[in-house]
Amino acid sequence: MTHREVGISSVSELGQMVRAVRKESGLTQRDAAALCNVSLPFLNGLEQGKATAQIGKVLSVCNRFGIDVRLRLPGETA
């Protein structure tokens, strides 16, 4: 799998990335939710950019799709 780096600054942008990777994987939301062990409403909310998503579940979904979430702390360079 090739990787590309994408910066995000909102829950909405993260949801868009999750949706794009899910679709690239050829999965329906229902199948992806089962694969990630989350509910269909949760995955739908994440993809819609709802700010109420639980970070643990968000990270689980990202991890399952190979989305590496990184933090850039102040003072660090790229």
Question: What is each PLM-predicted segment?
Answer:
Residues 54-72:
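DNA major-groove recognition helix of helix-turn-helix/homeodomain DNA-binding modules
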Residues 27-42:
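Short alpha-helical DNA-recognition segment
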Residues 1-13, 48, 63, 68, ...:
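N-terminal flexible/basic segments that precede or flank functional cores
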